[in-house]
């Protein structure tokens, strides 16, 4: 009996010590458990899903499927890596490691995150940035300068490390916070053109003569500035917007950006000037800056993109355009649909946004070419369902407002919702008809102006009727 009492006493003592330890743990180690994040974006819609109650199960199923195809320990030096697909002989690019780390932290898989990050660190070059191309046997490629860095990858890796620090704390085997700060410093020193703040596409080339708008991630840079205190990153974000303003001189109002350009928005020598597989990511990276920080430049640019793609509907999106808007390809795939859905998060057209959400869920690329499009698809699904919060916010509740918040914006408009009940159906058509006959006066006037010409008349009624019988794909039209 004495031994039993002694054991009970020891157990109680251990529990008491653990209780004190738990109370002493830093708050950011227990602030959240990943998907589903119980947060709300401070600006614009938080989710464009049709049924939010189904989102978590869908995302977790997609995550398990993605891991089964993309995560491998083969050729990873004892760690784990993100492999591409059969079309590239299952190699690894640093871009994919950035995507994998963002996904792993959002789905709260710390062990996987650590394995992926250790692989990343095993492939740091002399500038403290990741080799951009490694073959399936863990060899850095030489034919394409694989030992250099790709800026978009390292900026995603840095953001993932900040997420990790805020979700899990930095007192474990990996000091995520220190790793993030070091990487962010290396990025600034080697991937930003000094004097101009132009984002270089890599640590060994580019700048004002050639840059890549799909690498522009202004929300990331604002987080870096707040996290490290290095406010030069805010100037990098501003320069990204300035370059896109230059592009607008040449894109005929489409909002489309090229794969590559100069800092003056003109074609870069020897590089694609079309909206193709690089440029497709621009809407995703830019829209996040509106959701997190309310930047009106992000909203304006993404609203233009949404308006352009709405003309053909979600099912009409293809995998290549001139920046003036002419189609140059006809494949309909995940690489292009998800990022357009992300762009719609600035709230220009919520009817079209929901159409884009459904198409993003529905369209998944075949596995032979599955790496790129399906990775972007899952990342954008996280964002457009409210599961990609600012890592510097309270990840367990409401986001912390920006330090200099912009004025609150008016509610987003659901065009066609004439009676204001949140739906667009025949009741709205009847209400609009009664309004035109002057039998009612109290309607949702902005939503009733479905052609956005500033007037409510029979043209709006015709367009709403055509939308309800599905002869036009979206509102406004």
Curated annotation (Swiss-Prot):
Q: Organism's domain of life?
A: Bacteria
The reaction(s) annotated as catalysed by this protein in its Swiss-Prot or TrEMBL entry are:
Endohydrolysis of (1->4)-beta-D-glucosidic linkages in cellulose, lichenin and cereal beta-D-glucans
Q: Does the keyword Aminoacyl-tRNA synthetase apply?
A: no
Signal peptide coordinates: 1-32
The active site of this protein is located at 95, 152
Q: Which GO terms describe its molecular function?
A: cellulase activity
Secreted among keywords: no
GO BP annotation list: cellulose catabolic process
CDD domains in the record, alphabetically? Dockerin_I (cd14256)
Q: Could you say which EC number(s) this protein's record lists?
A: 3.2.1.4
Q: Which UniProt keywords apply?
A: Carbohydrate metabolism, Cellulose degradation, Glycosidase, Hydrolase, Polysaccharide degradation, Signal
Tell me the InterPro entries matching this sequence: 6-hairpin_glycosidase_sf (IPR008928), 6hp_glycosidase-like_sf (IPR012341), Dockerin_1_rpt (IPR002105), Dockerin_dom (IPR016134), Dockerin_dom_sf (IPR036439), EF_Hand_1_Ca_BS (IPR018247), Glyco_hydro_8 (IPR002037), Glyco_hydro_8_CS (IPR019834)
Q: Where is the Dockerin domain?
A: 411-477
Family membership: Belongs to the glycosyl hydrolase 8 (cellulase D) family.
What this protein is reported to do is described as: This enzyme catalyzes the endohydrolysis of 1,4-beta-glucosidic linkages in cellulose, lichenin and cereal beta-D-glucans.
Record protein name field: Endoglucanase A
Species in which this protein is naturally found: Acetivibrio thermocellus (strain ATCC 27405 / DSM 1237 / JCM 9322 / NBRC 103400 / NCIMB 10682 / NRRL B-4536 / VPI 7372)
- The UniProt gene name for this protein comes to celA
């Amino acid at each position: 009996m004495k031994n039993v009492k002694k054991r009970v006493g020891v157990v109680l003592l251990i529990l008491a010590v653990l209780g004190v330890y738990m109370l002493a743990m830093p708050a950011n180690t227990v602030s959240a458990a990943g998907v589903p994040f119980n947060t709300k974006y401070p600006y614009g819609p938080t989710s464009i899903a049709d049924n939010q109650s189904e989102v978590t199960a869908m995302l977790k199923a997609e995550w398990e499927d993605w891991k089964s195809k993309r995560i491998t320990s083969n050729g990873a030096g004892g760690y784990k890596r993100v492999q591409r697909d059969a079309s590239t002989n299952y190699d690894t690019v640093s871009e994919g490691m950035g995507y994998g780390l963002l996904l792993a932290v959002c789905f709260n898989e710390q062990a996987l995150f650590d394995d992926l990050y250790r692989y990343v660190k095993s492939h740091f070059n002399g500038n403290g940035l990741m080799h951009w191309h490694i073959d399936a046997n863990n060899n850095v490629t030489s034919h394409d300068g694989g030992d250099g860095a790709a800026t978009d990858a390292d900026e995603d890796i840095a953001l993932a490390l900040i997420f990790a620090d805020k979700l899990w704390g930095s007192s474990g085997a990996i000091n995520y916070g220190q790793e993030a700060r070091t990487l962010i410093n290396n990025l600034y020193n080697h991937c930003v053109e000094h004097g101009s703040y132009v984002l270089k596409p890599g640590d060994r080339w580019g700048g004002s003569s050639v840059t890549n708008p799909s690498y522009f991630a202004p929300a990331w840079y604002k987080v870096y500035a707040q996290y490290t205190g290095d406010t030069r990153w805010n100037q990098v974000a501003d320069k990204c917007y300035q370059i896109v303003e230059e592009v607008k001189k040449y894109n005929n109002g489409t909002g489309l950006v090229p794969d590559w350009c100069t800092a003056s928005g003109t074609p870069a020598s020897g590089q694609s000037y079309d909206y193709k597989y690089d440029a497709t990511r621009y809407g995703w990276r830019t829209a996040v800056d509106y959701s997190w920080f309310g930047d009106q430049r992000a909203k304006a640019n993404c609203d233009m993109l949404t308006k352009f793609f709405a003309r053909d509907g979600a099912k009409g999106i293809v995998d290549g355009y001139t920046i003036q808007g002419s189609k140059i390809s006809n494949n309909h795939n995940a690489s292009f649909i998800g990022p357009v859905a992300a762009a719609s998060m600035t709230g220009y057209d919520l009817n079209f946004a929901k159409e884009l959400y459904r198409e993003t869920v529905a369209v998944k690329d075949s596995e032979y070419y599955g790496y790129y499009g399906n990775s972007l698809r899952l990342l954008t699904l996280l964002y457009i369902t409210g599961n990609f919060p600012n890592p510097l916010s309270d990840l367990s509740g409401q986001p912390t407002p920006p330090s200099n918040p912009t004025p609150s914006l008016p509610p987003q408009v659901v065009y066609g919702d004439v009676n204001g009940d949140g739906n667009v159906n025949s009741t709205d058509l009847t209400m609009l008809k009664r309004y035109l006959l002057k039998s009612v006066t109290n309607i949702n006037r902005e939503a009733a102006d479905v052609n956005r010409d500033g007037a409510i008349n029979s043209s709006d009624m015709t367009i709403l009727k055509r939308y309800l019988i599905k002869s036009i794909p979206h509102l406004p039209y």
